[in-house]
């Protein structure tokens, strides 16, 4: 009880000291994003064939696994991936749904493994972002993507986590030679569902 009280008191003190800087930084980011929206091309992409492929993948996952939570996660992720591809926009409620489904899929015995999976999945992206910021003073990964990555990390095992993110980054770098601004979340959707399909088929 005393430890709990000390921990919460420490958190309250640290938050009171750091919150102004956090708020001002978020406010600055919101203003910058607003300016980008004002100058952004209003055309929204339409990809009907790709949409059909993306939205039928959860059906395949369910057919192979009979796991409704996994299939539901894939469906919500397909919505996120398509909206990011089409308009570079991710609805907030889909982020919450992804996290909720990912948390529901956890078992108590998997908590430590899930923590490592999230960490391994995030690490290559964080290193890539840090490299871009230090050398180019540029954001190479959209900040909104980091709201999606933990949910994906919770749905995979540690042995595949880092390699999946590395594949995501390599594919983005490869395809960006021909197509500008490849959305990383869309690529992550295909690698995640591809990995799940291979696992369910016994390929890996």
PLM regions: where:
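A membrane-topology feature that recognizes alpha-helical transmembrane segments
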Residues: 1-204
């Amino acid at each position: 009880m005393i430890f709990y009280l000390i921990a919460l008191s420490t958190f309250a003190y640290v938050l009171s000291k750091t919150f102004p800087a956090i708020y001002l930084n978020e406010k600055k980011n919101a203003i910058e994003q607003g300016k980008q929206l004002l100058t952004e091309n209003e055309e929204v992409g339409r990809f009907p064939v790709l949409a059909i492929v993306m939205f039928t993948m959860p059906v395949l996952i369910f057919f192979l696994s009979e796991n409704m939570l996994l299939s539901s996660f894939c469906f919500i992720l397909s919505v996120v991936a398509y909206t990011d591809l089409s308009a570079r926009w991710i609805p907030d409620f889909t982020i919450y749904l992804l996290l909720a489904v990912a948390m529901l899929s956890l078992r108590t015995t998997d908590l430590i493994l899930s923590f490592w999976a999230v960490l391994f999945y995030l690490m290559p992206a964080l290193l890539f972002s840090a490299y871009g910021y230090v050398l180019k003073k540029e954001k190479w990964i959209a900040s909104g993507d980091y709201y999606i990555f933990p949910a994906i990390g919770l749905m995979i095992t540690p042995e595949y986590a880092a390699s999946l993110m590395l594949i995501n980054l390599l594919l983005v770098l490869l395809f960006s030679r021909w197509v500008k601004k490849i959305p990383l979340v869309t690529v992550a959707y295909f690698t995640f569902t591809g990995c799940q399909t291979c696992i369910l088929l016994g390929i890996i």
